[in-house]
């Protein structure tokens, strides 16, 4: 399979250049100043303190590897359902070309509930972080496979200066070493290889020995059943980012409750 991540990153750079021309940074700053912030990390820790799994429930219409996951796709309804059934936070895809996401989906989801929201996209430039703040995101994703360490550190510092939480995502031990240079407590381990889109939940388990106790491990991708959840919780992994399993269910929120609670 061709290197999907490289293709996505090339498109992102083109998108950023176009967006900078159409919406200057100063305009985004004005929009951002009108947005409140919700405590993303705090919401996860509150679930842990209550003895529950903390689930970042994803709103995702499609993916490059699986195609369309959900035909009947109403982000506000999905967000409300997640909130009613125990989600800690939301993750909303805003990438249009590869995941059929939208900024509008994030805005609609956030307006429909009180949960903090992660902008799920491929961040390559500080402009996208101000964009995230302006659209109402409370957290952003930084993907180690797409960024060198100095750039990742700069992007994290900028996000934190705007009050945004940062979830740094890794897939292997080298990327984990890179991620551990950041200040964020949120370490996402993607069980899906973004270069091949192959998935194994063993990826998370194999890296737990590297992680300091003050970090929050978020296992991402490939969590498809209660058995997968139990496997992770037995290894003291209590934070999950789940999309596909919920999106394929008739009632996403009910599937969340069935798998986790």
From Swiss-Prot:
Transmembrane segments: none annotated. GO terms for biological process: L-tryptophan biosynthetic process. It comes from the Bacteria. The keyword Amino-acid biosynthesis applies. Keywords: Amino-acid biosynthesis, Aromatic amino acid biosynthesis, Decarboxylase, Lyase, Tryptophan biosynthesis. GO terms for molecular function: indole-3-glycerol-phosphate synthase activity; phosphoribosylanthranilate isomerase activity. SUPFAM superfamilies: Ribulose-phoshate binding barrel. It is an enzyme of class 4 (lyase). HAMAP family: IGPS_B. PANTHER family: INDOLE-3-GLYCEROL-PHOSPHATE SYNTHASE (PTHR22854:SF2), TRYPTOPHAN BIOSYNTHESIS PROTEIN (PTHR22854). This is Indole-3-glycerol phosphate synthase. It comes from Burkholderia lata (strain ATCC 17760 / DSM 23089 / LMG 22485 / NCIMB 9086 / R18194 / 383). The gene is trpC.
């Amino acid at each position: 399979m061709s290197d999907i991540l490289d293709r996505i990153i090339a498109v992102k750079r083109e998108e950023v250049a176009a967006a900078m021309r159409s919406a200057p940074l100063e305009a985004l700053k004005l929009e951002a100043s009108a947005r409140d912030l919700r405590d993303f990390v705090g919401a996860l820790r509150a679930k842990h303190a209550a003895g529950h799994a903390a689930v970042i429930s994803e709103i995702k219409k499609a993916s490059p590897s699986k195609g369309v996951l959900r035909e009947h796709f109403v982000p506000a309804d999905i967000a409300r359902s997640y909130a009613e059934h125990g989600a800690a936070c939301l993750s909303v895809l805003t990438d249009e070309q590869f995941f059929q996401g939208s900024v509008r989906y994030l805005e609609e989801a956030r307006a429909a509930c009180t949960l903090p929201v992660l902008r799920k996209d491929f961040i390559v430039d500080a402009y996208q972080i101000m964009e995230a703040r302006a659209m109402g995101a409370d957290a952003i994703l930084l993907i180690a496979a797409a960024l060198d360490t100095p750039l990742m550190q700069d992007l994290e510092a900028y996000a934190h200066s705007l009050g945004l939480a940062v979830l740094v995502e890794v897939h292997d031990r080298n990327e984990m070493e890179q991620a551990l240079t950041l200040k964020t407590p949120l370490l996402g381990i993607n069980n899906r290889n973004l270069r091949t889109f192959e998935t194994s939940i063993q990826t998370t388990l194999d890296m737990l020995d590297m992680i300091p106790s003050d970090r929050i491990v978020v296992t991402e991708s490939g969590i498809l059943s209660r058995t997968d959840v139990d496997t992770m919780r037995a290894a003291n992994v209590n934070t999950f980012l789940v999309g596909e399993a919920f999106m394929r269910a008739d009632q996403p929120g009910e599937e969340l409750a069935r798998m986790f609670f």
